A protein has these predicted regions:
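N-terminal, polar/Ser/Thr-rich
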Residues: 4-5, 9-38, 67, 449-455
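Surface-exposed beta-strand/loop patches in extracellular or lumenal glycoproteins
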Residues: 44-64, 181-201, 490-499
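A surface-exposed beta-strand-loop module
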Residues: 64-135, 140-141, 180-186, 517-527, ...
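Beta-strand-rich binding/interaction modules
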Residues: 68-70, 205-209, 472-535
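Extended, low-hydrophobicity, Ser/Thr/Pro/Gly-biased non-transmembrane segments
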Residues: 113-232
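Juxtacatalytic substrate-recognition/specificity segment
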Residues: 239-339, 343, 347, 351, ...
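Amphipathic alpha-helical substructures
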Residues: 282, 395-477
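Acidic/His/Gly-enriched intrinsically disordered linker/tail segments
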Residues: 337-413
Length: 555
């Protein structure tokens, strides 16, 4: 009863996200035969809140347990509990609540020595309990310690190092991504040093972690991660060979050699196009890509810094799109996630357009919009500034929305102006949020404040277009002058194409429709107008079922 009462008092006073972890110094021992992980080490935490803090929260995967926590070489006072959260593949965390001797002032730090251990088998609990099919869940949550392959990603997959975060729930489309995003933002300046010992390793197995490309396991190997926002701590133990390409080191399982060759060719194929569209912005130092093969053919890819974990047995299209994303990331460095993540997605869509068609590219865009639509629907009344592309911590949301923003920007200003602006971009000069807007305006000679206000600096949701009226008037000499009025029921303004279907051919005019407003456009029809359509798929909107209007001419 005393422990329960103590825990209740602690939990009521907890601010789980008050602290950032500024440094980890960990010793890891992995026993693949037992799927076991043992960790001893030191961590430094800083109070980043505005108030003194008496309690510190430490969380690890629920398949691990706390063995010891010390402060100043003395056992710390702490209690433990299971904390439900989907930031770990088990759907839960083993949480230790540490009582400090006295409240820690804002910006002050505390050093803790910790010990924890347990097993890490593959676990799909968090996914299957929300209805994800078992096979799909295994392809997503493939992390595990085993004799044949060991792969552990960090927060968001397996919490194998201590964190402190509010709960995330997979039933909420944005909960996990937002929680992980807030954590990563707090860890932007953090550093982790880890010594990894792998028991009973074969002669062919190697360790991949941090900046280590291919370390033997005959003795403990040192791993280093800096900037835990961009470089999520992970490690892989696997028997892999190396294919050193011009721009990437590709590590592959011996049976996947042909896939490694295919990926090397894919990188070579896409790099010239990326250079044309985005320019060359890499520093030339530390930007060489690294690819690590996964043994599961449908495993979900993962990226950390310049490293990609992915199955090299994927189909040709998937390999090409991964190569586009990787090349875009390495060749366009920006401190702003909406720029870097968005341009990676934009480059993929642009490549599909180049190799296939505009229709195929827009179909690809539309097929990936459902999550964006769901995310916007789930946040009515949220703070438009905090949910904006420049402030949101939800990486998936930022990537998805920013991809569409870049596609719309190309539609607005044209490829020539957009390409010139991107070539002129300098990351070191990007000191304020409006820098990119000014670059594009300088090349396009258009005022884009309305667009950036609604799509980048604030989240106004998505537009929702419908045609409210069409008036066709016969003109001398034949044909019709058709006036189309479109209404935007949503909050975000957009320049949208209005298509007039005729008995012989189509005509297209673009129209800017502000949020919660109407606008009209006149189109000269050379033959009988049949149907008016607003939006060809280039603009994301919340409802596309009301975009067509059948024209009835008065005879």
């Amino acid at each position: 009863m005393g422990v329960l009462l103590c825990l209740t008092i602690h939990a009521s006073a907890l601010d789980r996200e008050a602290f950032s972890f500024t440094r980890y110094d960990l010793d890891l021992t992995l026993d693949p035969g037992q799927q076991r992980l043992g960790v001893r080490g030191k961590i430094t935490l800083r109070n980043d809140s505005d108030a003194p803090q008496r309690f510190v929260t430490l969380q690890i995967s629920s398949s691990l347990h706390w063995a010891s926590i010390q402060m100043a070489d003395k056992s710390a006072e702490f209690v433990t509990q299971t904390y439900a959260s989907d930031v770990d593949h088990t759907g839960g965390l083993s949480e230790a609540i540490v009582t400090l001797p006295k409240p820690l002032a804002p910006k002050d730090t505390v050093n803790l020595t910790v010990g924890y251990e347990g097993v890490i088998p593959q676990d799909t609990t968090r996914l299957t309990r929300v209805g994800v099919p078992a096979n799909t869940a295994k392809d997503s949550d493939w992390d595990q310690i085993s004799a044949s392959f060991t792969g552990l990603r960090g927060i968001g997959y397996v919490v194998w190092y201590p964190i402190a975060a509010h709960a995330a729930n997979m039933s909420d489309p944005s909960s996990l991504s937002e929680t992980v995003g807030r954590w990563k933002r707090r860890e932007r300046d953090a550093e982790m040093v880890a010594s990894v010992a792998f028991l009973a390793a074969s002669d062919r197995q190697r360790l991949f972690c941090g900046d280590v490309g291919l370390a033997a396991l005959d003795k403990p190997a040192a791993c280093l991660w800096r900037d835990l926002d961009a470089n999520v701590p992970f490690f892989v133990v696997s028997a892999q060979e190396l294919l050193a390409g011009p721009s990437a080191d590709i590590f592959y399982l011996p049976e996947h050699k042909s896939g490694a060759n295919d990926y090397a060719m894919a990188l070579k194929q896409v790099e010239p196009s990326i250079a044309v569209w985005l320019g060359q912005h890499s520093s030339g130092e530390g930007t060489r890509a690294r690819v690590i093969d996964l043994p599961y053919p449908d495993a979900a890819p993962f990226e950390s810094g310049n490293t990609w974990l992915m199955p090299l047995t994927a189909d040709e299209t998937s390999l090409l799109l991964m190569a586009v994303q990787q090349s875009a990331k390495l060749n366009f460095l920006s401190p702003r996630p909406w720029i870097s993540l968005g341009l990676q997605g934009y480059a993929q869509v642009r490549y599909i357009e180049q190799e296939k068609s505009r229709e195929t590219a827009q179909a690809y865009l539309q097929s990936h919009r459902e999550a964006l639509i769901d995310a916007e629907r789930s946040l009515p009344g949220s703070d438009p500034a905090m949910r904006s592309l420049i402030n949101s911590t939800d990486e998936f949301y930022v990537r998805t929305k920013a991809t569409n923003v870049w596609w719309m920007l190309r539609e607005l200003v044209g490829e020539t102006a957009l390409t010139a602006a991107l070539h002129n971009y300098k990351a070191e000069e990007d000191k304020d949020a409006m820098y990119m807007q000014r670059l594009i305006e300088a090349q396009s000679h258009r005022d884009l404040a309305w667009f950036f206000d609604d799509w980048v600096y604030r989240d106004r949701g998505l537009p929702d277009f419908r045609i409210t009226s069409v008036f066709a008037r016969a003109v001398v000499g034949g044909g019709y002058l058709v006036t189309v009025t479109a209404e935007n029921l949503g909050g975000a303004a957009a320049e949208v194409p209005v298509i007039l279907r005729m008995s012989t051919k189509d005509a297209v005019e673009k129209l800017v429709v502000p949020g919660k407003s109407k606008a009209s456009v006149r189109i000269l029809a050379g033959s009988t107008p049949i149907r008016a359509i607003v939006n060809d798929g280039s603009v994301p909107e919340s409802d596309t079922r009301n975009n067509e209007y059948t024209i009835e001419l008065n005879q």
